[in-house]
């Protein structure tokens, strides 16, 4: 994996979309504390569980993580 999860997630931003991953990306962009340099699933998951009230369900993160892994393959 060469790019960080945050870098990947920013490619999914779309302010006009109602797609769950796009909304996650839009909100993560506004989250000043998001761990932008992380490539670690557990670190990101823990951060989101404790701090990301904007994420309606962790399934959205899981789906975004799988897309991230696929993009790095």
From Swiss-Prot:
Coiled-coil parts of chain = none
UniProt cross-references to Gene3D superfamilies, sorted A to Z? YozE SAM-like
Lineage: superkingdom: Bacteria
A Pfam family: YozE_SAM_like
The positions making up the signal sequence are: none
**Family, per entry:** Belongs to the UPF0346 family.
Quote the protein name from its UniProt record. UPF0346 protein lp_1865
Q: Specify the species.
A: Lactiplantibacillus plantarum (strain ATCC BAA-793 / NCIMB 8826 / WCFS1) (Lactobacillus plantarum)
Q: What is the lineage of its organism?
A: Bacteria, Bacillati, Bacillota, Bacilli, Lactobacillales
